[in-house]
Regions:
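Acidic/His- and Gly-rich active-site-bordering loop/insert found
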Residues: 2-131, 147-154
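Acidic/histidine-rich catalytic neighborhood of metal-dependent amide-processing enzymes
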Residues: 123, 129-198
């Protein structure tokens, strides 16, 4: 019985035949935003605080995602960002978690690590996959939903630390702030694979 339940839980089901049409202009707009984020060097080092790097990045985010910064409550905890988007209900909040910092760029690169080059259908550079892509995706999704006048069913938090790459205190500070507010997330979306068990 356990195997049958696991199989049923893990087997994808076809939920829709909908296939979005390619939109090259939209894809390029997304690529350009991610490119700008990559060009903003947010390299972090263990126990070295360089707040000016993250202040520049935060200013960039405000320019790229104006509705997020106009409509959501923003809390900055030593460069770690927490945005709050109130929903119609508050019992099943979600947290969209990512990090702003990147590891030092070492070795040989096909494209310069902070070039943000858009080439061969990709955005190149440090943070393209770890994980300014997540920062961009979360902010862009909320930006577009705000533009459409969408109100979430439950509270949404965007949490983004600036010390993840060296296991610093950023994420713990964000968690402490959520706990202080009495937030018990129903769902946390973070980088990495899915977790299907407690």
């Amino acid at each position: 019985l356990g195997a049958a339940v696991a199989h049923a839980a893990l087997t994808p089901r076809k939920t829709s035949a909908y296939q979005p049409q390619p939109d090259p202009d939209r894809a390029m707009a997304y690529a350009e935003k991610l490119s700008a984020m990559i060009r903003c060097d947010t390299t972090s080092y263990a126990n070295v605080r360089e707040p000016e790097k993250f202040e520049r990045f935060h200013a960039l985010l405000a320019g790229l995602f104006p509705l997020v910064h106009e409509k959501l409550e923003r809390t900055d905890i030593d460069g770690n960002l927490l945005y709050y988007w109130p929903g119609r209900a508050h019992d099943r909040p979600i947290v969209l978690m990512s990090h702003q910092d990147v590891v030092p760029a070492e070795g040989t690169w096909e494209h310069a690590p902070f070039s943000g080059d858009i080439a061969d259908g990709k955005v190149w550079g440090r943070g393209a996959s770890d994980t300014k892509c997540s920062v961009m995706a979360f902010f862009q999704a909320v930006e577009e939903l705000l533009a459409a006048g969408y109100e979430p069913a439950n509270d949404v938090y965007i949490a983004s630390s600036c010390t993840e790459e060296w296991a610093g205190d950023g994420a713990p500070k964000l968690v402490a702030e959520l706990k202080r507010r009495g937030v018990r997330p129903f769902l946390v979306c973070d980088e990495g694979g899915g977790i299907i068990t407690e």
